């Protein structure tokens, strides 16, 4: 598979603090990749810069050969850690909004997944449980036919049933040419869907590795993560 995302010498400063420090990374299409680190490690900062929401202090990001900007936003689907949807909106209005705003939005696929959740399209977002709201937002993001999906902590704060639905939704909506980058600190829960992973800490890239190669050595991603972080 070809490299769909290239990050070179990426640094992001917030006043006197450094959010990312000289990160260089290349990720391939057709993979589900874990961006793994503790809270405050720089995961969200990196995702926001790939999505074009934050500008780097220095360094470059290219998505499918293009510098991050208006054109790359058309092929990048981003799930933020915190919702940006108004709680008073009805589900059908949110679907209409996504269909109007994104040319690659697959309404039929979104409706199919929402039906499997038992979500009434006339329901207001605020009437749904937290877990169901999280699932609805993921359905919307994964119903775009994007080349890159950026998912920021998609399974945080939801119950085990909701987590299983979220992971199944990610798996069932992957395509051979898309790349899914999942940011999380809940490594044991997500590692079963990963093809490879990246460890990040204090804004610095620690390592990148294939999951299958790690398993051949007799370790899990969660075990390696604990070992690496204990040594630092």
Language-model regions, residue ranges each:
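Conserved ABC transporter NBD signature motif
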Residues: 59-72
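Helix-to-loop junction immediately C-terminal to a conserved catalytic motif
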Residues: 51
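Catalytic Walker B motif of ABC-type/P-loop ATPase nucleotide-binding domains
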Residues: 149-153, 158
């Amino acid at each position: 598979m070809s490299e769909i995302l290239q990050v070179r010498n990426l640094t992001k400063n917030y006043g006197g603090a450094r959010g990312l420090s000289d990160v260089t990374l290349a990720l391939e299409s057709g993979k589900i990749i874990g961006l793994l680190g503790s809270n405050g490690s720089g995961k969200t900062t990196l995702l926001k810069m790939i999505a074009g929401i934050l500008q780097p202090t220095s360094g470059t990001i290219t998505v499918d050969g293009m510098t991050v900007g208006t054109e790359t936003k058309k092929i990048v689907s981003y799930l933020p850690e915190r919702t940006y949807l108004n709680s008073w909106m009805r589900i059908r209005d949110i679907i209409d909004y996504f269909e109007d705003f994104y040319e690659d939005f697959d309404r039929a696929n979104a409706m199919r997944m929402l039906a499997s959740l038992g979500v009434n399209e006339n329901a207001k977002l605020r009437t749904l449980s937290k877990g169901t709201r999280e699932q609805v937002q993921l359905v919307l993001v994964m119903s775009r036919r994007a080349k890159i999906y950026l998912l920021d902590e998609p399974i945080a704060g939801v119950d085990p049933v909701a987590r299983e639905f979220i992971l199944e939704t990610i798996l069932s909506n992957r395509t051979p040419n898309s790349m899914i980058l999942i940011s999380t600190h809940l490594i044991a829960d997500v590692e079963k869907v990963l093809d490879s992973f990246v460890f990040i800490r204090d804004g610095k890239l620690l390592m990148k590795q294939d999951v299958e190669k790690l398993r051949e050595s007799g370790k899990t991603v969660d075990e390696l993560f604990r070992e690496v972080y204990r040594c630092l």
